[in-house]
Regions:
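Glycine/threonine-rich phosphate-binding loop and adjacent beta-strand/alpha-helix elements that clamp
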Residues: 64, 76-290
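Conserved alpha/beta-hydrolase "acid-adjacent" motif
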Residues: 4-12
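C-terminal catalytic histidine-bearing segment of alpha/beta-hydrolase fold enzymes
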Residues: 24-106, 111
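Acidic beta-to-alpha connecting loop that harbors the catalytic carboxylate
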Residues: 1-3, 32, 235
Length: 290
């Protein structure tokens, strides 16, 4: 569930498309880096705050090998019992649960409008093609915990100086003290603002378009008292500037919304995986508890 080399969008919502097509499929979607059970410190320093660290060491699972063996035994040899065709999904805080599908069914949506429920704290609505953050929005602190699941969207009205432009959206979970961690991001070439593969055109400066952005899949638990921060730029970490760079002007209001799908913890089947017993895992747990 992190953008390392296997990206979340390679599996989400593909897992549901497979199921809907009658193809038997199972998912094991963790927050992991390459922290294998026999060397859980292998890439530990790379999994920093907001990049999987909060899910450590619950991300270190050795039972996936048993799952894989049972899968191949059944489907290649006809041996044993058919594996359960469900999705095991891990939140950014490390909690594992079972879902029939992912994105799951029966979620509730929260819509936060830019300039309203998402307050502009940067004092600008302009994104310059230099990679620097322009508009920055923050929500009010949540009164209750919020569990964001799967594919948040950012639908935003914009105008551009030319037929082009790009928007990078960074979504962060911020504590009452203002300490923030990355929970996800989205990026869009505005020539494809309607989505899909067909390039669109419009009248620069004079015409407003609605960019229908979708975030990489995320599963993020937000504590009560925390707030969300949405920062917009022309490009971001691990991305190149757009080949059609342009000044982008954000239009705030009811047509520009951050849309979050949420789940209720009490409705879900949570579980704890086999515990990592490597000394590195134990030392980390003792350190965080202390």
């Amino acid at each position: 569930m992190h953008d390392w080399n296997v990206d979340p969008h390679m599996a989400v919502p593909v897992i549901n498309q497979l199921k809907d097509s009658g193809i038997e499929a199972k998912g094991l979607f963790g927050q992991w880096d390459h922290d294998y059970p026999d060397r859980p410190d292998y890439h530990f320093d790379r999994s920093g705050e907001g990049r999987g660290r909060e899910a450590y060491p619950e991300m270190v699972r050795f039972d996936w090998m048993q799952d894989l063996l049972e899968w191949f035994d059944w489907y290649l040899k006809g041996v044993g019992e058919q594996p359960g065709l469900f999705v095991e999904i891990q939140s950014n805080q490390g909690q594992w649960r079972i879902e029939d599908r992912y994105p799951p069914d029966g979620m509730e949506s929260i819509s936060l409008d830019l300039g309203g429920a998402m307050m502009n704290v940067a004092g600008t609505t302009t994104i310059l093609p230099n990679g620097d953050f322009g508009p920055i929005y923050e929500s009010e602190p949540f009164e209750e915990p919020v569990w964001i699941s799967a594919l948040p969207r950012l639908h935003v009205d914009v105008s551009t100086a030319t037929v082009g432009g790009q928007i990078y959206a960074l979504l962060e979970d911020c504590s009452e003290a203002g300490d923030c961690i990355h929970i996800g991001h989205a990026i869009m070439d505005l020539r494809y603002h309607e989505g899909g593969t067909q390039e669109q055109t419009w009248l620069p400066i004079f015409q407003t378009i609605n960019a229908k952005m979708e975030f990489f899949a995320m599963d993020a638990q937000i504590e009560a008292g925390h707030f969300l921060r949405l920062s917009l730029a022309s490009t971001g970490e691990d991305y190149l500037p757009a080949s059609t760079s342009s000044i982008v002007q954000i239009s705030e209001g009811s047509s520009s919304n951050l849309i979050l799908d949420t789940i209720q913890e009490g409705d879900k089947l949570l579980f704890d995986p086999p515990r990592c017993t490597h000394p590195y895992c134990q030392d980390w747990l003792n350190q965080t508890v202390g």
